[in-house]
Curated annotation (Swiss-Prot):
Keyword Secreted: no
Record text on subunit structure and interactions: Homotetramer.
Single GO BP term: fatty acid elongation
Catalytic activity, EC: 1.3.1.9
Sorted UniProt keywords: Fatty acid biosynthesis, Fatty acid metabolism, Lipid biosynthesis, Lipid metabolism, NAD, Oxidoreductase
Keyword Thylakoid: no
NCBIfam families associated with the record: PRK06603.1
SUPFAM superfamilies from the UniProt entry: NAD(P)-binding Rossmann-fold domains
Biological source species: Rickettsia prowazekii (strain Madrid E)
Protein name: Enoyl-[acyl-carrier-protein] reductase [NADH] FabI
InterPro entries tied to this protein: Enoyl-ACP_Rdtase_NADH, NAD(P)-bd_dom_sf, SDR_fam
Residues annotated as catalytic: Y147 (proton acceptor), Y157 (proton acceptor)
Record: residues binding NAD(+): G15, S21, I22, Q42, D66, V67, M94, K164, I193, K194, T195, L196, A197
Source taxonomy: Bacteria, Pseudomonadati, Pseudomonadota, Alphaproteobacteria, Rickettsiales
Underlying gene: fabI
Length: 261
């Protein structure tokens, strides 16, 4: 039985690509806890995947969103203002890197990929937060998704590690800026999980095996694990929490060495 932690709240969910997306898992649990949701999709191709998911859980609002296009962002928030007037939480769930550079050496990263990765994976949080702030009339919660590769070198993660490091720093600065309006900003650092995005990382299966073997709980995380953490951060249970990187990784981040040498 759900407890209705988000009953009466409205939330914008970005980053859904298909039914394997972490954003989708978060949306499902948020809906179960009583939230009214608004989905976005990145392109017409993804619209065909996202619309059926929205219909599945009774999400009545869905919009195209290209975070590299200021007009697209403005159109979205104008629509939200018209339909909802205000809302309570935002999930920033998008990230991007050229999959051809998610292997080999980081030093080979192209300027174009560096720019695009930082823009879509990090700067978009700033832009969406700035727009959301004007519509979070009673305070609110902004949550983004990060990964341990922001802190430590993970083979093949490359430019995404740098983008996630910038994202985590942005969380702290945004939390400081927006706290005066009772808007909290946090990140969930999830362990590796099979998604459309992670499939682009070279040798991802090895990453999964290593994580499960090393983590104290001796398993990989599930989408539901991340969904539960997000609902907590969206809800009033976390009303005193902001600027935090919340780990959902079965304890992997606490380990210094997986075995004695």
């Amino acid at each position: 039985m759900t407890t209705g932690l988000l009953q009466g709240k409205k939330g914008l969910i970005t980053g859904i690509a298909n039914n394997m997306s972490i954003s989708w898992a978060i949306a499902q649990l948020a809906k179960k806890h009583g939230a009214e949701l608004w989905f976005t999709y990145q392109s017409e191709v993804l619209e065909k995947r996202v619309k059926p998911l929205a219909e599945e859980i009774g999400c009545n609002f869905i919009s195209e969103l290209d975070v590299t296009n200021q007009k697209s962002i403005s159109n979205l928030f104008n629509d939200i203002k018209e339909k909802w007037n205000s809302f309570d939480f935002l999930l920033h769930g998008m990230a991007f890197a050229n999959k051809n550079e998610l292997k080999g050496r980081y030093v080979e990263t192209s300027l174009e990929n560096f720019h695009n990765s930082l823009h879509i994976s990090c700067y978009s949080l700033l832009e969406l937060s700035r727009s959301a702030e004007t519509l979070m009339h009673n305070g609110g919660s902004i949550v983004t998704l990060t990964y341990y590769g922001a802190e430590k070198v993970i083979p093949n993660y490359n430019i995404m590690g740098v983008a996630k490091a910038a994202l985590e720093a942005s969380v702290k600065y945004l939390a400081n800026d927006m706290g005066e309006n009772n808007i909290r900003v946090n990140a969930i650092s999830a362990g590796p999980i099979k998604t459309l995005a992670s499939s682009a990382i070279s040798d991802f299966s090895t990453m999964l095996k290593s994580h499960a073997a090393t983590a104290p709980l001796k398993r990989n995380i599930t989408q539901e694990d991340v969904g539960g953490a997000a609902v907590y951060l969206f809800s009033e249970l976390s009303k005193g929490v902001t600027g935090e990187i919340h780990y959902v990784d079965c304890g992997y981040n606490i380990i210094g060495s997986s075995k004695l040498l």
